[in-house]
Amino acid sequence: MNIINAGYEFMTHIDGNEVLEKIEQAGRVCYKSEDLITEDSAKKFCENIIKRGHEAVLEHYSFTVKFIVDRGVSHEIVRHRVASYCQESTRYCNYSKDKFSSEITVIRPSFWRDNIESNDEYVKFAIWERSMCDAETAYFELLEHGATPQEARSVLPNSLKTEVVMTANVREWRHFLRLRTSPAAHPQIREVAIPLLKELQEKVPILFDDIEVE
């Protein structure tokens, strides 16, 4: 069994200036003010669009992110309906095969430490780890007895690693990040959403600056 940390990666190259320029080009059609486009007008235009709440304009730019998370977190991600998804399938992936190193991969819980010096947390982590091993054993035994992957997956845990590719427009990403960086969100989705937000704030001026993490 392999234990890894949750993470994400961009599948779209993001040029912040290009993003703003494309949004400005689309948005100025509304006002027929294309003649006001200059080399440095996009930033101010997008700032005003957000202040006015005219966020439909932000739908003219989309980008793609691949999340590496557990199955539980993936169910929260795909609830965002204004997006397109591809996800690793436990129906078709047979984790006994060599390309999976003949083992299941699970996501390390962010809320329990595998540090023996923190006794209470370590006990919880040890119980979790034991249950993951038991699930892996049961899964492989079912396969050995002729079960198909889609049948054997019924014993796989919520902590099983999955990869979810999400493509959404800027408006939906803003909505996603507002919800999933909130203190009310699940700790393990915040684990990927907060660094994603911070990276986007560095890559793209204006568009995500008003989203604050508590």
Label each region the model flagged.
Residues M1-E214:
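Family-specific signature for flavin-dependent thymidylate synthase
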